[in-house]
Structures are given as structure tokens and as C-alpha cells.
Design a protein with these regions (language model features):
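Carbohydrate-interacting/catalytic domains
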Residues: 2, 6-17, 21-194
Length: 194
């Protein structure tokens, strides 16, 4: 379920959440629950306690989305470098940077969102999707000059990593000292980098 929330909240457009999704509410498969006035449609807010881990994950994902305007831009993504800054607003990758694998059997995808295409200048964001049943190593695209990649979210563990302040992330870094040129992504999980 963390994967679903990560995909939803890292997508462009308005996230469509139904009341209770944030704590795993279910209507037991009933997609016509509008005509029920019983426990199928009632929300049991006690689940916010019993499902605290997913509830907290959703809260933190919403906060992450709010912090990064590149995740909720007003313009549609073009996959072109329309600003002439060296990277497109969005690019698609496979386990190798800049080499997307759209074959039928591929279960891995990387998406790079150019931070300078946000409403205000933002961090670049790279999202590594591994829907395969084994661990996979993802080669990360070169970060913007003077920056390096930091893992921010890992759906396998549900962990949100503490990031250094933006000032420290922008300092000059020698290319050979860049952190995370490759990253091992656990099976059926997503890792978000900034």
C-alpha cells in the first residue's frame, strides 16, 4: 500500500484519495457503496491507531509532496528541455540511467523530474520503481552540477530519510565524490531521491 501512495502522491495532477484511504479503510470490494448506510461506508476512526504506520506514511508523503513543487506543477510535462538547462522536465530511465526498458517483461522504471521546472526552483527528484520480485541495482543519472543524490523515501522499509539542509546539498562537489551512483532497490518497492 506504501507503493500505491508513493505513486499517487509523486504523480502530476490532483491526488484522488477517498476518505479513509489514509488508514487502509475498505468497502470490502463494494464499488456501489453510495446506497449503504451501514458499516460498509462508515469510517472507523479507531483504525488511525491500529493502522498508525500507514497513516503516518501518508501524512509524511503529503508533506513531501507539498515541499516539492515539481510534483504538482501547473504545466503538463513535455519530456523536453524547454528551458535549455540541460535536462528535460521529465525523463524516463531503466536500471541504467537514460536507457528506459519498455519491454513486456520489464518491471523496473526510473523517472527524473527536473526541479527547475517547478513553480519555484526545486530539487531534482529521481524515483526508482522496482516491481520485480528480486532486488535490482539502479544506476542513478548524474545529478545537477554541484549537487548529489540523497535517498528521501523507501517504501520497502517505510523510512523517510533525514536530508541535509538545502544549503549543504548545493555545495560544490567533485564528480568522483558524488554519493549514490548506484542504489540497490528492494523487491516490489520504490525509492525516491532528491
Amino acid at each position: 500500500i506504501r507503493n500505491a501512495f508513493t505513486m499517487l502522491l509523486c504523480s502530476q495532477g490532483t491526488p484522488m484519495l477517498l476518505a479513509g484511504d489514509e488508514f487502509g479503510n475498505t468497502q470490502l470490494g463494494n464499488n456501489n457503496a453510495y446506497c449503504h448506510d451501514d458499516n460498509i461506508t462508515w469510517l472507523n476512526w479507531k483504525h488511525t491507531k491500529s493502522e498508525q504506520d500507514i497513516f503516518e506514511f501518508v501524512k509524511r508523503m503529503i508533506a513531501f509532496r507539498k515541499q516539492h513543487c515539481v510534483l504538482h506543477g501547473k504545466e503538463p510535462l513535455s519530456m523536453f528541455d524547454t528551458k535549455g538547462i540541460g535536462i528535460p522536465d521529465m525523463s524516463v530511465h531503466g536500471t541504467q540511467a537514460w536507457r528506459a526498458d519498455f519491454s513486456n517483461y520489464s518491471r523496473m522504471l526510473g523517472i527524473l523530474l527536473g526541479g527547475r521546472y517547478g513553480i519555484t526552483e526545486d530539487d531534482d527528484i529521481y524515483i526508482a520503481f522496482n516491481m520485480f520480485w528480486e532486488q535490482k541495482v539502479f544506476e542513478l543519472p548524474n545529478p545537477t552540477v554541484g549537487k548529489k543524490w540523497y535517498p528521501a523515501i523507501d517504501t520497502h522499509s517505510g523510512e523517510f530519510f533525514t536530508l541535509p539542509p538545502k544549503k549543504k546539498r548545493k555545495r560544490k562537489i567533485k564528480p568522483e565524490k558524488q554519493l549514490f551512483r548506484e542504489y540497490l532497490v528492494e523487491p516490489r518497492s520504490i525509492v525516491v531521491f532528491v
